[in-house]
Regions:
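Nucleic-acid nuclease catalytic cores
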Residues: 336-337, 344-351, 357-390
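Short, contiguous acidic/charged loop-to-helix segments that flank catalytic cores in large enzymes
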Residues: 268-270, 303-312, 338-351
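Active-site metal-binding core of divalent-cation-utilizing nuclease and nuclease-like domains
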Residues: 45-61, 294-327
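Acidic-basic catalytic patches of nuclease active cores, encompassing PD-(D/E)XK
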Residues: 17-43, 268-301
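Extended, gly/pro-poor, charged amphipathic helical "stalk/hinge" elements that serve as dimerization
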Residues: 251-266, 275-281
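Conserved small/polar residues in nucleotide/adenosyl-binding loops
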Residues: 401-410
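Residue(s) in the substrate-gating loop at a strand-loop-helix junction
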Residues: 22, 30, 41-257
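Active-site beta-strand-loop-beta-strand hairpin of nuclease catalytic cores
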Residues: 65-69, 321-332
């Protein structure tokens, strides 16, 4: 039986001990070994290590090793509700098109019973079951073989060059309507990977039943580029959700190992980037109309102009710029995935304020520059600064974003 540990990114430490939410000495060393081994994939500042404890910085998701499933969640709810934080994280991933999942009541209820890994796997299984009832996917596969009878097109030029071919054989090129295609090979590989890694009798039973449909599909090494570049059309579109979930699992579970014998694996998302993208999509959906536009990572402005060369230097790139073309003004928003307040002490980084000052002075029509932090405490107001008279009517504000429940978003 798996051991489940839940922690909040940045806010909670994983400790060595015998408690319910603690790691043994052996488990702790296994985790450190995995993180060290994957240091080229994960950014170096992912962990903060102290004596017999560590915490994760800027990454959320799951890490599985030995019999441990470690779930790292962002602190998004004001009530410290694990299920709600998990729910809002999935909503963020869904809106940002990181996962092919649309939140509904059935999914919300399942989050009470499943960690993130089992949730992804169960959603994949249910999607596969739905499509398998309609039948496995077939497509025409281009094949070249030496045959006893003519089929398709005869390849005389290649036949003449090859040695050792029986004179009774014919070199043919033809199309075969087959289930042994790349899409099915990916789905089968994902099922095998799940079977090797998820120690749950119910899940294993369902996966084995799905695999019975793929007996004539080869188990192959899946090329990463080919996996990422696969296209969908009218005939294969019904398998899109299944494929995208299989891709998510394969990219993290087994892409570097065709023998399925990894000791550990992870599915992690960089929360700072995810938060920025999520806020951008939400604001764009509210702000944009016929005379208002939202620009993400706008690169139109520079801080300085070089007197010798005449070239502009030091490109500014605010996270979000809101343009009002009718009233000719701009609002600049920079998202910050960090706590503005720790132990009742408010911390404004001077570098952040200087950055906002550079933005609001470079954008001539900018009225407000907003530092947007996640809200972790109710009913709090933070500073607003007015610029000097030479920049009349310009303000820098610190505001908080409170994540609504996905129910509130419909």
């Amino acid at each position: 039986m798996s051991k489940n540990i839940y922690v909040k990114e940045t806010y909670e430490w994983i400790r060595v001990g015998n408690g319910e939410n603690e790691l043994t000495e052996i488990e702790y060393e296994k985790l450190l070994k995995y993180l060290e081994k994957n240091n080229d994939v994960l950014k170096s500042n992912i962990i903060d290590i102290k004596y017999k404890k560590l915490r994760f910085i800027n990454y959320v998701g799951i890490i599985c090793f030995e019999n441990v499933i470690l779930e790292i969640l962002p602190k998004l709810s004001l009530s410290d509700n694990l299920v709600k934080d998990r729910e809002i994280l999935l909503q963020m991933l869904s809106i940002c098109n990181k996962i092919p999942i649309t939140m509904n009541e059935k999914i919300r209820l399942s989050l009470k019973n499943y960690n993130l890994l089992n949730f992804f796997v169960m959603y994949f299984i249910e999607s596969m079951q739905t499509q398998m009832k309609k039948g496995i996917y077939f497509e025409y596969i281009n094949k070249i073989e030496n045959l006893n009878v003519m089929r398709g097109k005869i390849l005389l030029s290649t036949y003449a060059k090859e040695k050792g071919i029986s004179p009774m054989k014919i070199r043919c090129k033809y199309d075969e309507y087959s289930e042994n295609n790349f899409l099915n090979q990916v789905l089968k590989k994902a099922c095998i990977s799940i079977l090797c890694r998820i120690n749950d009798n119910s899940i294993q039973g369902k996966i084995k039943k799905i695999l019975s449909y793929f007996q004539n599909v080869d188990l192959i090494y899946i090329d990463r580029k080919k996996l990422l570049d696969y296209k969908f059309y009218k005939n294969n579109d019904r398998f899109k959700d299944c494929y995208l979930l299989a891709r998510l699992l394969l990219l993290n579970l087994s892409m570097d190992n065709s023998q399925n014998n990894q000791e550990a694996f992870s599915i992690l998302f960089e929360i700072n980037t995810l938060y920025e993208e999520y806020i951008g999509i939400l604001i764009k959906s509210i702000w944009d109309n016929s005379f208002r536009e939202t620009y993400i990572q706008d690169k139109s402005k520079f801080l300085l102009k070089n007197e010798q060369t005449g070239k502009k230097n030091f490109n500014l790139r605010p996270d979000i710029v809101l343009y009002d073309l009718k009233n000719e003004y701009e609002i600049i928003i920079d998202t910050k995935w960090k706590a503005i307040e720790v132990d009742s002490n408010v911390f404004y980084r001077s570098s952040d304020i200087y950055q906002m000052y550079a933005y609001i002075t470079a954008y001539e029509n900018a009225k407000r520059c907003i530092l947007l932090y996640p809200c972790i405490q109710k009913d709090k107001n933070y500073s607003s600064w007015k610029l000097s008279e030479s920049f009349k009517g310009k303000f820098i504000d610190c505001l908080l974003y409170t994540s609504p429940s996905p129910r509130d978003r419909g």
